[in-house]
Amino acid sequence: MVREVHVSGTVRSLCLIVAALVGCGFASPFSAESRFIPAPAKKTEIRWRDSTALGTPGDGRLVRGVRLPSAGRSFFTWDPVLRRAPNRGWRRWGTDDLVRVVLRVARDFAEAHPEAPRLGIGDLGLERGGYFGPKHATHQNGLDADVYYPRLNRRERPPRTAAQVDLRLAQEIVDRFLALGATVIYVGPNTPLTGPPAIVQPLWNHDNHLHVRIAPGP
């Protein structure tokens, strides 16, 4: 038995409008073609300026610092206190040279390993440098940054233990910072990461991240 269906004038009008839009080349927002189109990536804005590192990493200040963005195509930031991404903006300041080095390593690493997680960046320093807090003896003049080791399971968050670290990729990150002139790289004593002994040094509480320091600019 065929049941007669009555369509109201409002519904009929909506159907005609949809049909007209499709005929003009407008795809339905629920079509297969539009469902999987990724949103365009936001442009990473950085206010570049010539920075000056004063004093030492353990007793210094930062003049005209540059803030690392909260995230980009090749990196994410992590707040070690709140234990979430992104890191708060006031914790992401460094010299322009430091920010450039971090972004360069992140970009080159992502290009070499598109299957790997983005590089995780932790604390840099304060906008004007100075004492950062009880968990940081240095990070005072814009030359230090914490960088998390990639995890074996590819999750974009810091590893909990050295056993979760992808040591092959972590060593490559160490090597990339060395190639760009890092003067100090602290690594976890339970991670067999290597480099020139005067630069790559084991230090407690660094089993989930490395601490990189660059030289001050001229």
Regions found by a protein language model. Name each.
Residues 28-40, 149, 155-218:
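Catalytic cores and adjacent binding grooves of peptidoglycan-active enzymes
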Residues 38-40, 110, 135-141:
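Extracytoplasmic strand-loop-helix segments at the start of, or within, the mature domains
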Residues 47-54, 101-136, 184-201:
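Extended, low-complexity, intrinsically disordered C-terminal regulatory tails
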Residues 129-153:
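Short, surface-exposed glycine/acidic/tryptophan-bearing loops
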Residues 52-121, 172, 176:
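Active-site acidic/histidine clusters and adjacent loop/turn architecture
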Residues 113-114, 137-142, 178-179, 203-206:
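Extracellular/periplasmic catalytic domains that process cell-envelope and extracellular macromolecules
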Residues 74-91, 144-162:
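Short, conserved helix/loop micro-motifs enriched in His/Cys and acidic residues
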Residues 2-65:
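N-terminal secretory targeting signals
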